[in-house]
């Protein structure tokens, strides 16, 4: 059975193709269009996933959209009625688009699919999943568990913002829901907006900023903005929010509560107030997630937990669940946001609707390496066309040569194999560097990534060595768990109370300072030989040369740009930044060997997110 899953028209459009219970391919549209968080119909992603099986739309058994547009339209109308006359202007502006996109969605999808394949005639093949079921399916059906609780947390789907389900064998049963406008994801996004970052894009910046502050406003949030019950259920006080009726997340009451106006631009100074506010909403989020997790464990007595939805990308909160040992096992879908809804929609149809027999696969996600790959011949041809000078190193010396460059302090663009599906670079479209360097975080943030100095970098570590460096002794292949640095590798702080806010940034905290956040934590990727042999071998070579089995791993892009997809993207990013080396498959490109006329001004190419 060939099933295409599709998500689009909100943010992070994507497509995924299943051949029975095998993920053939999956990719986000942004990687092809180079428009970050592209919400448009995923023409390019669909063409790619179908090409991996060499089939056309008309050969598919089903095309499954990730949510139900009629239910979403119902929510939009009922919300307007509930809050009327507030929001009349936004309602009038939005209703024509809602009618087109929600009431005639099936025809809209059919027309777009026919552009890709004029022979596609069967409208009945187009199916619809529910938004939170798609999220839940993307997590449970890719997990190694026969029986698990499933917690989905995001902004909003049709009505649900939080759902608790039970996955057993090939079925998912939703047990509990919290409905719009009461949403943990939207609460976090409201603070993202208030702090001057982009909604549905900058939430991870709030999480990264939080350790620079103190949670001074947690009580204020819990007293005024959200009514949190003992079981983790909650209600927002809509007096302070405009997202249900307007185009803004917060209103004047919100500003009055915190005695400060919205930070309008990301170029405005970040003050201690902003850092304390980030720390506070992160603290409240962790409190709520932990309460929900503990309550559902107590109620259902199931030892496994699957996490999905945009809030599941909050790796700090995920790490707290792990640290509290509420569950024996935790699985997090690497594409937890709406992009992963494409995969989940296809899986929900396969199992829940078609009753396909489920086989447990310990690597169902294939490391999340589900995107395009390029042969040596393809890459070499592009290098010649672009007039790029390159060298080949013999296989037996390849990894040692790259590790030597890393030891010399080089920042390297690492382009190998299949592109990752989801927001994280996991060693195939990565920028890598030596984590032992005290200056590397500043170099990468300011000269390579062109992003804020407070942003932390993640470590990739050999799986067998993870507990040498971190308070973690389990798999974290998708960079979705945060854990503390081991005490043994910390550098003693002789003045623990003298530095505040951004002053903490330049203090050396461990023997791997470039991946140690200011609170002595790290967002960890464990690297496994079975899923990424090349990256594993590079870490082995670096360990052999330096004694350190950790590398900085950050996504191969600049701020505001999607992760690079093809060799041309990689070359442009390399030539437009202060990357020293580009490695694509076996080809090694040194910046100093290139004609200066090829260098690009990349800093202003993308709108900063």
Regions found by a protein language model. Name each.
Residues 279-305:
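Phosphate/ATP-binding catalytic cores across multiple sugar-kinase/actin-like superfamilies
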Residues 55-89:
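Hydrophobic or amphipathic alpha-helical targeting/insertion segments
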Residues 7-25, 33-36, 79-90, 97, ...:
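Flexible beta->alpha loop and helix N-cap segments adjacent to enzyme active/binding sites
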Residues 44-52, 63-67, 538, 546-548:
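Short HxH-centered metal-ligating active-site micro-motif
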Residues 29-55, 289:
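N-terminal phosphate-binding loop and adjacent alpha-helix
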Residues 1-4:
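Extreme N-terminal starter segment of soluble prokaryotic enzymes
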Residues 100-103:
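Feature for intrinsically disordered/low-complexity regulatory segments and propeptides
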